[in-house]
Amino acid sequence: MLALRILVGTQTGVAQLVAQEIELRLDGSDIGVKTRLMDDIDATVFAGGGVFLICTSTYGQGDVPDGARPFYDELLNKRPDLSNVRYGLIGLGDKGTHAATFCFAAKKFDKILGELGAVRIGEPLFNDSNTELPEDEAAQWMEGWIVLCRSQLGIEASA
């Protein structure tokens, strides 16, 4: 069984909606999913390692959402060893209005997680809020990402 923890950074609730849709689509599968808002966690969420999905919007001029900021800052300042962490990444942003800082919050998380030894599985999904329904695009991306996770981690799907 694959245990997946989705960590959500959101300013207006869209990233949380995306995480909820992913959780709904995985309901009834052999994947155990637990979703947590970054507002309510600290770096100890990574204790013991595992598979994580970072799902975050970008706020303002490329900023991490307000509620996720303490969590992000703790990673920057305490620099825990995350070599036993595997993760995927979904970034949400507005390419039309903020092209220069499109999905910067997700890119910031990707950078710090990599620096701390975590290993990203697959390519990130960067969703432009002007082109697609983020929850539908994320759910579609998730199908391929789960296959890649299982392959890289040597976990077979149960019937």
Where are these predicted regions, by residue range?
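FMN-binding flavodoxin-like domain, especially the glycine-rich phosphate-binding loop
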Residues: L2-R5, G13-L17, R25, S29, ...
